[in-house]
Curated annotation (Swiss-Prot):
Keywords: Acetylation, Cytoplasm, Immunity, Innate immunity, Isopeptide bond, Nucleus, Proteasome, Repeat, Ubl conjugation. It comes from Arabidopsis thaliana (Mouse-ear cress). Residues 1-44 are annotated as: Disordered. This is 26S proteasome non-ATPase regulatory subunit 2 homolog A. Component of the 19S regulatory particle (RP/PA700) base subcomplex of the 26S proteasome. The 26S proteasome is composed of a core protease (CP), known as the 20S proteasome, capped at one or both ends by the 19S regulatory particle (RP/PA700). The RP/PA700 complex is composed of at least 17 different subunits in two subcomplexes, the base and the lid, which form the portions proximal and distal to the 20S proteolytic core, respectively. Interacts with JMJ27. Induction: By salicylic acid (SA). Repressed by drought.
């Protein structure tokens, strides 16, 4: 066998490209002589040998043929193991490809013919014309040998040809068995050589992902599943669900339970969640699962199959019920030293502004006080103390009663409810503080207390159902504000619980001819939240009948929009399941028909990133309509809802919203800021911030109000200094306009929400999981903001409290095996996407080291900076249980 050529030697290097590009000359002899002069001796020898083999292959003597083929095969194999440039033997055999092919046709079937097929198959790698798939054709009639020995590039090329051939055979309905045998070989080869992504791509092309389960092993299953889960985002349904199913099975096979649980939650498959619990035997791990379920916000009952011991089961159910949330949040607050209560004035920072604005604001107007109530509630949310509502009543500076009465009628509702927000997640203390309002004779105060009870219980489940016990009796009272307080309270406290007792109480209201429209609207919303994403037929029927019973005048009312929204929430993220209901909605009155259609479509595909639905919604937004058509608002919001699931979609959506601002009609421009607010919620991107800042000075006050609220949403819970500065300047710019000033105040409250410890983002677990209840709360607020004047600036401002459904601490808190806080060093930095990269790349960049508990901003990831402990969850967010590492040695 000739020695292989050193790639740097002059002969090889100079001719590398030339040889492959030259057009055959008229006088082959002359050309050959010229070419031979340029080759080094080794190359020349190789070339002559190969030419000799080609002649010998055509020799009638089978012995000679066999020897020649064997030598040729050796030459090719020796050179194809590395594929940086076209290997020499392939280059020199180019002119003879046709000759060999023609001779191959004439050979009788024998082992020698198969041998030649193998060689032709490799030559076809560089020679065959596009779309001929010759490499594959020769491979299929060649020997059954190991394909890997011909090198990586060859296998890769084969995989590409198989995909094309498969599609062709599928359309002709021909047999694919021979292809599948080859696929088996290729997948095995790829999985052995760290090319999991290519193996997965091939299996997706031939629609046989189940093969993966046989080929994954301990070394590559994580990389394989990572690739599968990130690819699922870009696949059309139902393929995406299938891919996730496979990765769930792989995780279960290797007992990687936390990851399997995440996929089970993503698929919203209770059977899978149960399976994770029953398969895992480690109680500590089960506790970690419970924290994950609690963060996701679904109602989940453990049974004796999942946890055998009664005491253990009770302890675990407590974690699922989120009873530990308040305690963990306050631990974080103490650690960061932000327990000191803040007043609205601390947030407004009016002293930083020029004189004229701050002087005008000293007037004690009801609208200003209402704004201060909300700011106070958002900023001190969950801390259990503030300076307006929880002051002891005998203090000289003014008591909680005083602040309550600084608000006018319906303002008192929001003020009383704000006490629930301040006591957020601390059920016992919250209920005892709200108790005094139940004895009031003032209906708005009772309504606020009822709503407050709902807020305190938000996301916290309790066996004795205090919220239902307290609120159930008030649903059928005379006064509609009290009824709304009770209904909204139930909707917030039981969101996602699918509680039938409450359905039996609320459904009759929808079909009660005497009930006022606002009560019906809120009942529909609450039912939508309690049954969010459940596709419950009975609730859907009740809401549909309620919509059909509305008169022309009622359909024009701003609150009517909550009926289709309640209906949409039932199908949140459930894709095709909405189609039957969408058909029914086409029979509604034309005033509401399109609005309903857009709302259903956008809810059903929320967070799926479905490109076709984005196109449908864009088409709706492109129409230039008469005044009075309101369905484009939800279509614009729908764009954001569908596209928000992954970064690429978000960036594309931001660009198309920019276009809409330039070319869209007025009603579209009003919704665009809200859509931007949803896309970047609690994630203040500078470009979006600048767009909203520009829109906040728009001549159309509706656009300006939407933009201001959205500035609050994108900065929610971040304490972002730049947004805070913008809002301060806006407060002096709009100091004469009460409505706009109210919006500025609300936005200021949102930016400083929870003193910077909370987030409104419905995504968690590194943006993989979307919490349905959180999204429901945000979307409800955004739909209300499509028509600000009658709702948020009218007497239904307490709709703002729906945001509590999305409020979550943006913390990472490590606890020991007894669930007591444990401080360990962690690195926090920008998350890096490492899917499909070789080796073990760093997963975070630009990190700082802190000791836990720590705050995580949008797009940040944490990793432990010590080997002393092993975290029980691969994703460090929320509550993380640490187990001591038995192999750790102190240095």
């Amino acid at each position: 066998m000739a020695p292989t050529q050193d790639p740097n030697s002059v002969g090889g290097g100079a001719k590398k490209d030339e040889a492959t590009l030259k057009v055959p000359s008229k006088d082959p002899k002359k050309k050959d002589e010229k070419k031979d002069e340029d080759l080094s001796e080794e190359d020349l020898e190789l070339k002559q040998n190969l030419e000799l083999y080609v002649e010998r292959v055509q020799d009638p003597n089978p012995e000679l043929q066999k020897a020649a083929l064997e030598s040729m095969r050796q030459e090719i194999r020796a050179s194809t193991s590395s594929m940086t440039s076209v290997p020499k033997p392939l280059k020199f055999l180019r002119p003879h490809y046709g000759t060999l092919k023609a001779f191959h046709e004439t050979m009788a079937d024998s082992d020698l013919k198969k041998y030649l097929s193998d060689i032709l198959s490799v030559l076809a790698l560089t020679m065959s014309a596009d779309g001929e798939r010759e490499s594959l054709r020769f491979r299929l009639i060649g020997t059954e040998g190991d394909i890997g020995s011909w090198g990586h590039e060859y296998v890769r090329n084969l995989a590409g040809e198989i995909a094309q051939e498969y599609t062709k055979r599928q359309s002709e309905e021909a047999s694919i068995d021979d292809l599948m045998e080859l696929v088996q070989q290729i997948v095995a080869f790829h999985m052995k050589h760290n090319a999991e992504t290519e193996a997965v791509d091939l299996l997706m092309d031939v629609e046989d992902l189940d093969l993966l389960l046989e080929h994954v092993d301990k070394t590559n299953f994580k990389r394989t599943c990572n690739y599968l889960t990130s690819a699922a985002r870009y696949l059309p349904g139902p393929d995406d669900m299938l891919v996730l199913d496979i990765s769930y099975m792989i995780y279960m096979k290797f007992e990687e339970y936390p990851n399997a649980l995440q996929i089970a939650l993503f698929l919203d498959n209770t059977q899978y969640v149960k399976q994770v619990f029953t398969s895992c035997t480690d109680l500590l791990k089960k506790k970690q699962f419970c924290y994950m379920i609690a963060r996701h916000g679904i109602t989940f009952e453990l049974d004796d199959e999942m946890v055998a011991d009664d005491d253990d089961r009770e302890a675990l159910q407590d974690i699922v019920n989120n009873t530990k949330l308040s305690e963990g949040y306050l631990t974080l607050a103490r650690d960061i030293e932000v327990m000191e209560a803040k007043t609205p004035e601390d947030i407004y920072k009016a002293h930083l502004l020029d004189g004229r604005a701050s002087s005008g604001a000293s007037v004690d107007s009801a609208r200003q006080n209402l704004a201060a109530t909300f700011v106070n509630a958002f900023v001190n949310a969950g801390f259990g103390q503030d300076k307006l509502m929880t002051v002891p009543s005998d203090s000289t500076t003014g008591s909680s009663g005083n602040w309550l009465f600084k608000n006018k009628e319906h303002g008192k509702t929001s003020a009383a409810a704000s006490l629930g927000m301040i006591q957020l997640w601390d059920v016992d203390s919250g209920l005892s503080q709200l108790d005094k309002y139940f004895h009031s004779n003032d209906n708005p105060i009772i309504a606020g207390a009822l709503l407050g009870v709902g807020i305190v219980n938000c996301g916290i489940k309790n066996d004795c159902d205090p919220a239902l016990a307290l609120l159930g009796d008030y649903i059928d009272k005379e006064d509609s504000s009290v009824r709304i307080g009770a209904i909204m309270g139930l909707g917030i406290s039981y969101a996602g619980s699918q509680n039938d007792q409450i359905r039996n109480k609320l459904s009759p209201i929808l079909n009660d001819a005497k009930a006022p429209l606002d009560v019906i609207a809120f009942a529909s919303l609450s039912l939508g939240m309690i049954y969010v994403g459940s596709c419950n037929e009975e609730v859907a029927q009740s809401i549909i009948f309620a919509l059909m019973d509305r008169s022309e005048a009622e359909l024009g009312d701003a609150l009517t929009r909550f009926l289709p929204l309640g209906l949409g929430l039932l199908y949140l993220g459930k894709q095709e399941s909405v189609e039957a209901t969408a058909e029914v909605s086409k029979t509604f009155n034309e005033k509401i028909r399109k609005y309903c259609d857009m709302t259903l479509l956008s809810c059903a595909y929320a967070g799926t990133g479905n490109v076709l639905k984005v196109q449908d919604l864009l088409a709706q937004c492109g129409e230039h309509l008469e005044k009075g058509d309101i369905h484009q608002g939800p279509a614009v919001l729908g764009l954001a809802m569908v596209a928000m699931s992954e970064e690429l979609g978000v960036d594309m959506e931001i660009r198309s919203l920019e276009r809409m601002l330039q070319y869209g009609e007025q009603n579209i421009r009003r919704a665009v800021p809200l859509a931007l607010g949803l896309l970047c919620i609690s994630n203040p991107k500078v470009t979006v911030m600048d767009t909203l800042s520009r829109l906040s000075h728009d001549t159309d006050s509706e656009v300006a109000m939407s933009a201001i609220i959205s500035l609050g949403l994108i900065g929610a819970g971040t304490n972002n200094a730049r947004i805070a500065g913008m809002l301060r300047n806006l407060s002096s710019y709009y100091y004469k306009d009460m409505s706009l000033l109210f919006c500025v105040r609300i936005a200021q409250g949102l930016v400083h929400m929870g003193k910077g410890l909370l987030t409104l983002s419905p995504f968690h677990s590194e943006r993989f999981l979307l919490s349905p209840t959180a999204l429901a709360g945000i979307v409800t607020l955004l739909h209300a903001c499509l028509d600000m004047k009658p709702i948020i600036l009218g007497k239904y401002h307490y709709v703002l409290y729906f945001l509590v459904l999305a409020m979550q601490p943006r913390m990472m808190l490590t606890v020991d095996e007894n669930l007591k806080p444990l401080s360990v060093p962690v690195r926090v930095g920008q998350a890096v996407d490492v899917v499909g990269q070789a080796g073990r790349p760093k997963t975070i960049t630009g990190f700082q080291t802190h000791s836990t508990p720590v705050l995580l901003a949008a797009g940040e990831r944490a990793e432990l900076a010590t080997d002393k402990y092993i975290p029980l969850s691969p994703i460090l967010e929320g509550f993380i249980i640490l187990k001591e590492n038995p192999d750790y040695r102190e240095e």
